[in-house]
Curated annotation (Swiss-Prot):
Family, as annotated: Belongs to the PanB family.
Compartments in which it is found: Cytoplasm
Molecular function per GO: 3-methyl-2-oxobutanoate hydroxymethyltransferase activity; magnesium ion binding
Main subcellular location: cytoplasm
Any one GO cellular component localisation term in the record: cytoplasm
Keyword DNA-binding: no
Cofactor stoichiometry and binding remark: Binds 1 Mg(2+) ion per subunit.
Catalytic residues in the record: E182 (proton acceptor)
Gene (UniProt): panB
UniProt protein name: 3-methyl-2-oxobutanoate hydroxymethyltransferase
Residues that, per the record, bind 3-methyl-2-oxobutanoate: D44, S45, D83, K113
Catalytic activity: 3-methyl-2-oxobutanoate + (6R)-5,10-methylene-5,6,7,8-tetrahydrofolate + H2O = 2-dehydropantoate + (6S)-5,6,7,8-tetrahydrofolate
Function: Catalyzes the reversible reaction in which hydroxymethyl group from 5,10-methylenetetrahydrofolate is transferred onto alpha-ketoisovalerate to form ketopantoate.
Domain of life (superkingdom): Bacteria
Source species: Clostridium beijerinckii (strain ATCC 51743 / NCIMB 8052) (Clostridium acetobutylicum)
Amino acid sequence: MKNTVLTFKQAKEEKRRLSMLTAYDYSMAKIIDESGVNGILIGDSLGMVIKGEDDTLAVTMDEIIYHTKAVKKGAKNALIVSDMPFLSYHVSIEQAVLNAGRLIKEGGANAVKLEGGANVAAQIKAIVDAQIPVMGHIGLTPQSVNAFGGFKVQGKSESAAKQLIDDAVLIEKAGAFSIVLEGIPEKVAELITNAVSIPTIGIGAGKYCDGQILVYQDMLGMFNDFVPKFVKQYANVGNVMREAISSYVKEVQAGDFPEEKHTFKIDENELKKLY
């Protein structure tokens, strides 16, 4: 059954936890979708895990649209949410609505996500008024990495925590259907979750959120050089892939691949005509 914004609303009302993962291409979207997640985010995290950048700031609208198209073809049941990249909604409300519309019309997304609190409430309202569902995102917002001075946990003081709660309430009033809470103390996330009637989706925000989201490369253990504190690795796919590829290389070098069962035949009479 296709997940929609109503699915998310009903899940909170019925106290059912929501699961989300990122995806950036057809193959992974298909596997993730078949595994039963409620939503797939085409995140601007692709700048880091696909392009190898140090942050998300260089990701463009065209790149998000390209990857959204691919994910759309692989995911039949998950709600497809596309990130609005840095500076795609900051300049003006008109710009925000037009770019959100591109993600829906050109990419095929079901909803868009943008970062910020009170400072983007007007953009959220305008996008929602254009009949485009919006997912909010507060806390450690990666597009603000330079303003934060790095990827640092947010909401650790009373004033900062109160600001996050106020931002969440404003985001709900603006019409968002859910909010991502990233990199904030667990108890602060619980307060936010109880303060709003829309579902909260946590990443590094503890167990009291209405749902969880992770970058799939992190939870599958594809990278060994850095594992965020909030990530649980459910597999070590990186090692499995390296071992498989190493075996392939060795077999090719030794002449053991391809075997006879991997090859195609030609009729002997036809073959003789070639000599």
